[in-house]
Amino acid sequence: MSHAADMIRTHPEDLTGPDADVLAAAIDACFDCAQTCTACADACLGEDMVAELRHCIRTDLDCAAVCLATGQVLSRRTGHTTDVLRTLVEACLAICRSCADECRGHAEMHEHCRVCAEACERCVAACEALLATL
């Protein structure tokens, strides 16, 4: 069980909302994707062809920022309306799709882009599962 799942399970308030396991999986996927996108951007900066990776770097950094914010808000189960959560998760889903597509375009040349695309795709799947419960 992840720390996110432990925190949901041990929260002192009986909060209604999305399924705890689905929520924990989305939180974990968001934070994993944020870290992976940050590392991918840094790896792109280390490549000789860094100028050609400029768009990828920017997309990685945008995705990392949105995933981090989404994971943080989902972790705070303090009265957010479903509409706000849905909008945030939809934004996360959109940037993760965009980043996965961008990184897939470089995956054959740069292993770090393949890894990043996979993390983004896992986050997309987790966000889709969470949206189905909201």
For each feature predicted by the language model, list its residue ranges.
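Amphipathic alpha-helical hairpins
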Residues: 1-134
